[in-house]
């Protein structure tokens, strides 16, 4: 393989990598990245995920009567569980000596702007 062919192959590989990382739908964040002006952060994240998950459940056949009778208690338990999961992930990442990238909900929706579909991906 000639030098120019090798250079062209490397250049195409880099171009493909840049294209995929820019338009692939996955966000990558680094410590110290600023929040997106339209990003949703803090307790609002749990509220939006809860709403999106309830909408998704309704679209897939709706909630049963037992869940409807429990009302907000069930929603509160889901929110607490979700916030607990976020705290555990945060604590796990705090101990890392490296400033590694993140691809969680904070990266997706606070550091960047989430669509409704991206919030729905966090439903269990």
Curated annotation (Swiss-Prot):
Disulfide bonds join 29-107, 41-110, 53-123, 109-114. This venom insulin facilitates prey capture by rapidly inducing hypoglycemic shock. Intraperitoneal injection of this peptide into zebrafish lowers blood glucose with the same potency than human insulin. In vivo, when applied to water, this peptide reduces overall locomotor activity of zebrafish larvae, observed as a significant decrease in the percentage of time spent swimming and movement frequency. Residues 59-92 form a propeptide. The keyword Signal applies. SUPFAM superfamilies: Insulin-like (SSF56994). GO terms for biological process: glucose metabolic process. This is Con-Ins Tx1. The modification 4-carboxyglutamate is found at residue 118. Expressed by the venom gland. Belongs to the insulin family. The modification 4-hydroxyproline is found at residue 34. One of its GO terms (cellular component) is extracellular region. Residues 1-24 form the signal peptide. The keyword Signal applies. Its main location: secreted. GO terms for molecular function: hormone activity; toxin activity. Keywords: Carbohydrate metabolism, Cleavage on pair of basic residues, Disulfide bond, Gamma-carboxyglutamic acid, Glucose metabolism, Hormone, Hydroxylation, Secreted, Signal, Toxin. Heterodimer of A and B chains; disulfide-linked. InterPro entries: Insulin-like, Insulin-like_sf, Insulin-rel_pep, Insulin_CS. Pfam families: Insulin (PF00049). It is found in: Secreted.
């Amino acid at each position: 393989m000639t030098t120019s062919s090798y250079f062209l192959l490397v250049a195409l590989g880099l171009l493909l990598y840049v294209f995929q990382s820019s338009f692939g739908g996955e966000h990558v964040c680094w410590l110290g990245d600023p929040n997106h002006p339209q990003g949703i952060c803090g307790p609002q994240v749990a509220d939006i995920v809860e709403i999106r998950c309830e909408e998704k459940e309704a679209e897939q056949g709706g909630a049963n009567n037992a869940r409807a009778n429990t009302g907000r208690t069930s929603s509160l338990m889901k929110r607490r569980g979700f916030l607990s999961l976020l705290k555990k992930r945060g604590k796990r990442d705090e101990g890392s000596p490296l400033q590694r990238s993140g691809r969680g909900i904070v990266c997706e929706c606070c550091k960047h702007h989430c669509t409704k579909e991206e919030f729905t991906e966090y439903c269990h």
